[in-house]
Amino acid sequence: GKENGPKFNPFFIPKMISDIAAGQISIMYGFHGPNYATCSACATSTNAIADAFNLIRLGKANVIVSGGSEAAIAACGVGGFNAMHALSTRNDSPETASRPFSASRDGFIMGEGGGCLVLEELEHAKARGAKIYAEVAGVGRSADAHHLTASHPEGLGAKLVMLNALEDAEMKPEEVDYIN
């Protein structure tokens, strides 16, 4: 009864902690080494890739499975973003409502998905004859330090991230093939 406090399912804690998926993958495949969940909203997967890249170049691991997922399309997710007026109101034209880089944007479109990348130290990959799809040259991270939901009007945070990534990669802007 209530005199003993609320009753909890024995799986309450394991089901609520954010790194349970990473732990389950580790158990399923026998992966050892760094194992944790990155939590940084829309930047989580990119930050997870940056963490993996940094751990590999520091010699802390040879191979890391890195990625993320999102499943926010539920009453609390849609309701919360709607209450913040963060969602686009272009409901009459949903196929053109998403315009993240437009001056006339009026919010974002919710989505769900997930993905993983396997990052591997270059010489380790070459030694096993792996096909090399891409190389991470550098990473940059920064906060806008402007507003809870709006980007800085002059893009200062985005600019700083790109400058940090260029410096980290020791590259010039014209040498860049891809920006995430």
Where are these regions (language model features)?
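Active-site-proximal alpha-helical scaffold in enzymes
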Residues: 21-22, 26-29, 34-70, 108-130
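Phosphate/pyrophosphate-binding betaalpha-module
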Residues: 68-105
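A glycine- and small-aliphatic-rich helix-loop capping segment at beta-alpha/alpha-beta transitions
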Residues: 1-5, 55-58, 78-93, 153-157
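Flexible, glycine/proline-enriched loop segments at strand-loop-helix junctions
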Residues: 7-14, 35-41, 104-110, 148-152
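Condensing-enzyme catalytic core mediating Claisen C-C bond formation in acyl metabolism
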Residues: 92-171, 175-178
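Active-site-proximal gating segment of KS-fold condensing enzymes and close homologs
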Residues: 1-36, 82-86
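Short acidic, glycine/serine/threonine-rich loops at helix termini
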Residues: 49, 74-80, 146-151
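Acidic, glycine-rich active-site loops and adjacent beta-strand->loop/helix elements
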Residues: 16, 40-44, 68-73, 138-143
